[in-house]
Every structure is written in C-alpha cells, then in structure tokens.
Amino acid sequence: MTPIKKVIEYGDRSLVLETGCIARQASGAVVVRYGETVVLVTVVGMKEAAEGRDFFPLTVNYQERTYAAGKIPGGFFKREGRPTEKETLTSRLIDRPLRPLFPKNFINEVQVIATVISSDSENDPDIPSLIGASAALALSGIPFTTPIAAARVGYIDGQYVLNPTLGQMEKSALDLVVAGTEKAVLMVESEAQELPEEIMLGSVMFAHQEMQVVIQAIRELAEEAGKPAWDWKPPIEEEDLKSAVQEVGEARAQEAYQIRSKQERQASLAELRNSIVESLVPEENSRWSREQVLEAIGALEKRLVREQILSGGERIDGRDATAIRPINISTGLLPRTHGSALFTRGETQSLVATTLGTERDAQVIDAIEGERRERFMLHYNFPPYCVGETGFVGSPKRREIGHGRLAKRSLNGVVPDEESFPYVIRVVSEITESNGSSSMATVCGTSLSLMDAGVPIKAPVAGIAMGLIKEKDRFAVLSDILGDEDHLGDMDFKVAGTEKGITALQMDIKIDGITEEIMRTALSQAREGRFYILQKMNEIISTPRQEMSEYAPRMIVFKINPEKIRDVIGKGGATIRALTEETGTTIDIVDDGTVKIFSADKADGQEAKRRVEEIVSDVEVGKIYEGRVSRLMDFGAFVTILPGKDGLLHISQISAERVKNVSDKLSEGDVIRVKVLEVDKQGRVRLSVKAIGNE
C-alpha cells in the first residue's frame, strides 16, 4: 500500500497525518506529526464478540518511549515499566470522548494504543494522540459514529491561543483541552487562574470552531485509505420484552425511586430486578436471556427517572433541579496531622489530611520533556467500603488517579508559590462515603484542610458536579448530582473555583445537541451552587490559620554569601552533617545562597541558624569572641573563634603577667574570651587575652 498523507495548518504549525507505512496489520494505524513530536496510533478490533458479554471492552493505552526524547530510562532494568501518571491521565483523556461514539450494544473488543516515538519538548503529545486515535478508528472500518478532533487552548494577554507550546503555557492563565465532533463538543478538561464563566465558555467555542479543519482532514484520509466498514448490525430491539418488563415492573420501579436513602433504594431495586428476571426467564425454554431482561429493566428505570425530572417533578432524593444536598463540615479533627477536614455533602463524604514537608519531600517527575519537581501533591483514595462493597485494596486505579488530578488542578491556582511558602505540601483525600461528586467533595475538603494547616492559599475553592437530562427540546440542568443521576443523565459537568472565578472545568457529554446556550445555563447554575458551598465553608473557616500545627516542621529561610556555601558544607560534607546531627535539623542550601532550615522545634532551628551565620561571618578586628583552645604550641595556642576559623594567641598575649609555659595557663578544650588584634593579608588572625583588660 502506498503511504497516504494529509497536511494541514493547525495553530501556527503543520499537522501531518500519514497511514499505510507503519503497523499495517492493525485494523487502523496513523502516524501523527506535530512540530517534531510524532505519535504512532493503532486500533485493533475483534470481529467476533465474546458470548455472554454485556459491556463494551474498549481499552486505551497511551505510552511514552524515552528514546522519543533521546534518553535512556533510569533504574536497574533500563526500560519502561508501569504507566506513569501522565500516561494514565492521557489514556483517560483519549478514552472519554471516543467511548460515546461507538454504537449502542456494540460489545466487540477494541484496543487503541498511542505510542510517542518522538518528542520535541514543546508540543505535548496528548492532542496528536487523540487526533490519531480518531483517524485510526475512521480508517479501521470498526463501527464508529463520526470522526472527532481535539485542541488545546491557552489564554495569554487576553487572547485565546490555539495549541500553545509548553513554553507559551508558562505564561497562560488557562490550560483547556476540548474534543468534539463536527457538530458538538464531547469533552472538556481544563485548569484556569480564576477566570470568569464567559471566558471559559468562549474558549470551548473557540476550540470547537478551530478543530473543524482536522475533522475534515480525517474524513478525506478515510475516503482515500479507509477499510471497508464492518458488516455489523445492532441486535433487533425486542418490543415484546420492553412491554413485558414495563407491565411487570413500572409501578414497582416508580415506588423504588421514591426511596430517598441510596442503600435502601438500591436494595429495593435489586429485589425488583431479581423478581422480574425470575418471572421472565424461566429455567427452561426461555424466550429471552437474563442479560436482555436486565438491559430492558435498565432502560425502563432510565426512562422513568428522566421523565419525572423533565416534567418538573422531584429528583431521586427529593430535591429540585438547583438544590444542593445538606452540607456538614468540621476541621482539625485529626490531632497529629498538620491539617485536616471532614466534608460531607448528602451521602458523599471526604476525609482530607494535609502534610507539610521539606524540599526533599518534593516529588521528582522524570518526564520525557525533562525532569521537574512537584511541591504540591494531591492523592485521592476510593476504598470499596465507601459504597458499601468489598473489593481489592492496593495501588490506585485509573479512576482514582484521574479524580485526584482533577482536584489538584482545581487547587493549583490558589496554592502559594515557593517564595511565599517554601514547604512541600501533600494532601490525601479518603472518600469515606460516596453517592456522586466525590471528586468535588475532595476539592472542598482539600481547601478546608489546607487552611486548617495554615497554608496561605489565595482564596477558598469549592467544587460542584452538574448533570443534564435532555429529550428533544426539553432539558433540565441538575446541580450537585447523585451517582444514579450521573449514570442516567446525558452530561457530567464538574466546575471548581473561588468567588472570583473558575479554577478547573471538566465536562463529559454522552449525546449530540448540547448547545452553547445549554452550556451557558449549566455554568451559571454551577456558579450559584459554588457560591452557596463557599458560603457554608466560610462559616467554618474562611482564612488560613495563623499558627501551624505544633507537629508541622518549622522553617527558617535566610541568605548567605554564595561564596561561603563551601564553608557551610565543609570537606566531604562534614561540617553540615555535624551541624544537622547536633541540632536535629534538616538544612537545604540553594546555589544562590538561600538557606532553608527545617526543625521540629523552633529553638533547634534558631540554634542551627546561629551556627550557620557564625560559619559564614567574617572575623572582625577589635571584636571579642568566645573561643575554644584547639592546640597548644611552645610559642602560644591556636584558638577556634568561629567554626573553621582559628587564630593565634601568642604566649605574650595570654596574660598581663609573664608566662613561662603556655600549659601553665591554658589546656586544650578551654573556653576563653579573646580579642582580635589583626587579620593579615593572608587571612591569619592574631588574638589577645591581655588586650581585653577590663572590657
């Protein structure tokens, strides 16, 4: 096959899509080049579906090869290992807009693999990877509704910037990724510096408009190089089954959805489902399978709940569309942590703890674009007990990593910089109860916990999850959605921010037809909800505590002459090692002469500072020092007056009286007061006891 290439201008750079040269045994394969970043994206679909499967097994793997940046992996094995956090997050980023575009009831296994094979450290591979996944699916013949494209938007000097480089992103007040089809936005993922709703909405619309050229290029590529479409037909809907399920279960399902408690409601629904299955799926000669009946029950439940909300009725838990669940907050509840908070909203609860550490505790990220250190870490845990289940407990799953990242992005804009608060910060959110919006409960709990720890954040941050139910021209935007509303709705829309503006926005849309007006309504309603939650939070704690926990490390920061750093460190690190051991402190020195002293006790830190200042201070002529006799000689004694600085006390200067033997007056280890008489050009110090006189 002759390679086929499409080249378009996208932003201020060329985007190249090429197929037919590499990975030709895959169902679809595209090499995407943007700048000097190159990603190979492959798609493989299985023509046959496994028997008895009732879900769509789509797997997305994004992987970065270190050779892409001309590096060899660290570690003993010198090869790539388990996925990094960036790889996990990008895999989720690709998965989220693709999944809704496969046909309903399509359950064949599909795997998308995006491999970064060249990285220029300026163009993030995530956008090319998403575009490549869309193009590979369009070429593969696998049932897939329509091509999508993706764009990143920055906001620099009041202007939207399409696909900014990593260098430009350092100056941007916005990092927003949008994926969408020709007609609709499907996904938004963003972090912002407290921007207003109109700017956020404008950036989404800007991205959607700009990405149309990419969708057109993918269509042209598929027309020229696409494989024949699979001969796949959706299973015929059983109208008789729908009628039978409705007849047996509609009234009971409506009753079950009047139960306000999540666990009681789920128990009632489980009993209902089992009852319907038993009545419609006899052991012998059954017309329908168990899976078919359960699917029909799910469709019935979805229709009932959606219709009740769209007709202006109460939601599952009795609220109206804009109401927020009851909020309970407490802070400082964990006595030994540096900061803590318990945030409860309805049946969702987050226990958050903050730990302050030294620079050595920062997380080292060995990314292909270069190594960096992260001072602010946020980890989200979702144990099985929070939803009343048993399950595996171990390393974090993709969902936990993704939710933690969203919460972190929500707080990044308000966390103080290193100059104003030199501590490393780690926050852990334990989801102890969950019924929807646990990531946004984490945002609220983290803001409270940081303030409880005395971290001077710029402003409190609250988060809220919004939902949407839409049927033709009717729609309802729901505030603070439950887990069931997320499952049965058409949109999951999470917004976090301060009173000033938005700090993070995440949106996943399952249907076409979400207009700009609907998004504007959702943002406006989210703003009202956010303000209400912030008000509740401010009633408990509205500003960071002035005093940190007594168990938090104390920090002293000061500057010394950079030329004196070697004196503080000493030969082979001996001086600084002795200093830290004797004072019980941790000392970090930066090349510019900044000294950071961390200690459990304030007095220990002050003592360490005094000793560092002694080491770097210059000997002053005429000043009296308290020194220690280090060596006795026939002609006098050497006295240490500052760490690493000795002076000669001549025998004639030991006393006003005549001294015959130095040992008659002095012994090694004696502490005596001496006055500096002179420092010669060679730095030699001459001392005297006699010159002190009556001083």
From Swiss-Prot:
This protein's cofactor list reads: Mg(2+)
One GO cellular component, as annotated: cytosol
| Gene it is expressed from | pnp
Question: In terms of one coarse class, where is the protein primarily found?
Answer: cytoplasm
User: Which PANTHER family does the UniProt entry name for this protein?
Assistant: POLYRIBONUCLEOTIDE NUCLEOTIDYLTRANSFERASE, POLYRIBONUCLEOTIDE NUCLEOTIDYLTRANSFERASE 1, MITOCHONDRIAL
Task: Keywords in alphabetical order, please.
Answer: Cytoplasm, Magnesium, Metal-binding, Nucleotidyltransferase, RNA-binding, Transferase
Gene Ontology BP annotations: mRNA catabolic process; RNA processing
| Biological role | Involved in mRNA degradation. Catalyzes the phosphorolysis of single-stranded polyribonucleotides processively in the 3'- to 5'-direction.
- What is the originating organism of this protein? Nitrosococcus oceani (strain ATCC 19707 / BCRC 17464 / JCM 30415 / NCIMB 11848 / C-107)
Keyword flag NADP: no
Q: What is this protein called?
A: Polyribonucleotide nucleotidyltransferase
Q: Which domain of life is it from?
A: Bacteria
